[in-house]
């Protein structure tokens, strides 16, 4: 059974990643109304008779979201049953399921009633939490933390602050990026790093949205760079922290490069999807560091109780 659960966890993680990228594809191609205003049917039909490209994209996104719902539910039930001895299992299972349902309902509401771009931008963030929760659940199932000897992890308050702070801030950056997509502001500023050679400062809403995201992205790049330097200097003996920040910096660098290429490739589809891919992976890595950070007090308590028993 455990082998089956491991396969299920991997397939579920991949399915949720496809859901995230599929949502970005729907937004990028303007396929949100590919099935009209009907849900769960498509243009009022179970199998649509008129298949335009927008319909195919929207319908595919709905099907992958539906399969993800089934897989996440099954994974939550089995992990709850067979891995309940791991303290984070129940919390992650609940988060995975609740946020997946929330993003599905929000997606349906957007189709039927429509939503403001500011509200639609939350949709990607909700999906991202579900994805990260499933990734962490998968890590627990594969006992990744034991391979890194996470029980002996030592971390000072400064490093924990950076882990929690960057993770929370990354979610804000994700929202600003999603807002850029939903406001159709990807090409509002045709130059980089300033908005335009003729007008370096933004003058209207779409330009402010675009430049706001750029500033937020530059700040997270600098923050992760600083945290990585700290990890390299002081955490070489803690591989999970050391490599966690190095991987995070690689991902945020790729994210930044692709973000610039989005501007200079006229917001090509490939760059837009890579932009969503890298931020999804980065958020998952940061959430894993958060999970380990929450264990520090537990590890300390366990060590304290053990020493008392020894005395």
From Swiss-Prot:
Binding site residues for heme o: 61, 123
Pathway as given in its UniProt record: Porphyrin-containing compound metabolism; heme A biosynthesis; heme A from heme O: step 1/1
UniProt keyword Oxidoreductase present: yes
Catalyzed chemical reaction(s): Fe(II)-heme o + 2 A + H2O = Fe(II)-heme a + 2 AH2
Disulfide bonds: 35-42, 189-195
Its EC number(s): 1.17.99.9
Keyword terms: Cell membrane, Disulfide bond, Heme biosynthesis, Iron, Membrane, Metal-binding, Oxidoreductase, Transmembrane, Transmembrane helix
Any one GO MF annotation of this record: oxidoreductase activity, acting on NAD(P)H, heme protein as acceptor
Entry keyword Iron: yes
Localization per record: Cell membrane
Regions of this protein lying in the Extracellular compartment: 28-62, 113-121, 181-211, 265-271
Residue spans crossing the bilayer: 7-27, 63-83, 92-112, 122-142, 160-180, 212-232, 244-264, 272-292
Family, per entry: Belongs to the COX15/CtaA family. Type 1 subfamily.
Protein name stated in the entry: Heme A synthase
